[in-house]
Amino acid sequence: MSDLSSAAWEQRYQTGDSPWDLGFPTPPFVNLLSSSEAPKTGRIAVLGCGGGSDALLFAEAGFEVVGFDFAQTAIDRANARANDRGIDSIQFLQRDIFDLETEFANGFDYILEHTCFCAIDPELRSRYVQLVHTILKPQGQLIAIFYTHGRSGGPPFGAKPQEILDYFEPQFDRILFKPVTDSIDRRKGDEYLAIFQVRK
């Protein structure tokens, strides 16, 4: 898939060609929330939220959640799941994430990243980092799973662990950065869990 437009992502959701959307929360986030490293509750943005599985996990854990996705079908699916579960502490909005900076500047305690950084054109990664910095509150945190596979092409576009650090460490402090050991089978060895905090 070389077309990364909103229409292309929408078509993939409409045709069911969305293997990144597991239909259940990713195990590393489930286990993080039950660990001693679990973040305190707050307002969290989920970028590229897809069908909302990870967003709903955090809502059920007491977070106030706003999920954003390029594709309206993904947003409709996420809203339906929230309604089915009776969750009202969550909102899903169809947006281009790069349009969020003005409306949501300093708007979130946390940002949740799972399959967004790997889905955008790698040339936009510096802009993504600046977006995250802008919409987080002072000392806000990015909670992320990054794809570190070495395969060419994408999406998902991989990134070496040091590349990820090089993008974020000029503006963020590293709280946690480690290989994921509880990935689903097809992602084993290809993921890093990170928590980066906006530097004072």
Locate each region found by the language model:
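Class I (Rossmann-like) S-adenosyl-L-methionine-dependent methyltransferase catalytic domain
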Residues: 2-45, 50-104, 120-200
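A conserved beta-strand element that flanks and buttresses the S-adenosyl-L-methionine
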Residues: 112
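Conserved acidic residues
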Residues: 109
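Short catalytic micro-motifs in class I SAM-dependent methyltransferases
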Residues: 115, 119
